[in-house]
Amino acid sequence: MKKYIYTTSLLFFVLISNIKAQENLSFYNLNDYVIQTQNISPVYLPKYKYNFSTPLNFGGDINSTIKLNDILVENGNNLKIDLNNLNSVAEDNNFLASEMVVNIFMLGIKTKRGSISFFQNIKSNLTGEFSNNMTEIAANGFVESFSSSSEKIGLTAYSEIGVGITRTFLKEKLAIGLRLKYLSGIAHAELEDSAQFSLDIDPTNFLWTLNSSNVTLNTSGGTDIDKKAVFGQNAGFGMDFGISYKLNDKFSFDFSANDLGSINWTEDVTNYNLEDATDVVYNGIEFENRDNVRDDLENALRNIIDTNESNNSFKSNIGSKILFSSKYQMSEKNVFRATYFSYNNPYVDIKPSFGLGYNRELNKSTYGVIASTGGNNGGFRLGANLAVQLGFLQLYGAIDDFSSLYGKVEQSNEANFRLGINFLFGYSAKSNDDKLAEKDQLLINNKAN
């Protein structure tokens, strides 16, 4: 258990300090030019008859209140971990949310009245929230009383394999998209939501009074990843839903709800439990040798509270996302879009984000910029997107915050990017209704002649 907790903690801080991120708003504005946008808006219709992708499509999102230089400080020509500095800048509540996505495979086929797609994605999410009580302990040890009830952490990695169908109605004014997904859990760790732990230390005699309730760490997976990534025993079901409506030639509206689903964790499950305790008193010790403080603490806790391990299966939600946008077609090639994004994370509260973007839409390429705000870090961000076609090859990229490119890495606490390559065949610039209208007009002209 010790090794597992230490590894998870290290991963927690590495991911905090690595990248800068937002919530796919720039990528969303690539619209129907890129087939992967169906991952966040299943109602988007591809422009090409056949769309094929490989694992060369990936992206990441990170949002944190902690920066790299809050943890690592210069020490001559080297860097060192400075927990005192981390403790000095820590807020009452500190936050992290990250996501990595790899599109393993995707095949999209445009039909007469919509599209059908087949896909597989690998996703990993790490979310955490911790108080400055934890940073105080990390920096100075157990020298005073503390209470822990806001600490939360959830780490999930899973594969999704599915099929998506989009259908148009009312002369292509209305479109509805639905994607059904089989979920296969790869690895998971979560602290029970209602876990509470408090320790009252009397500085005069070092008596400890300890209380704990519902302190359980549920874990699963982490081994035989190749087998679990396809059809493992940690199974679940997910769904994406989207709807769009074209009010007139100028205005249209899109709504999508993604990642509605959960995973049942039944394979390689271990529950690490700290038994409930109420006002348990222990004659504490003063830690004089900081090198052995971890072992001393562990031994002391064993004398106070019993710990045990179990193998009970459990269920976890994957975290739903909501996107709503309003599109204004200023002219044939100039589009403005206002977007609202909300993430219902199963472990922490994440504030919604808002974006206002512009895209120049050409026949086979598009490029644009977007200004956004919101999220737990707030502030103003400026991003951009691009999709170009070179023969049957498509290259695309999107980023929500330019400062993640030119800013100092050690001062970063937020980032979002999407990159990929697709193979496209059978371009169709006009809708089916446009084609039918042209045929009718041609027949009328022929009869008139």
Model-derived features: where do they sit?
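Bacterial N-terminal signal peptides that target proteins for export
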Residues: 1-8
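Bacterial N-terminal signal peptides
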Residues: 8-15
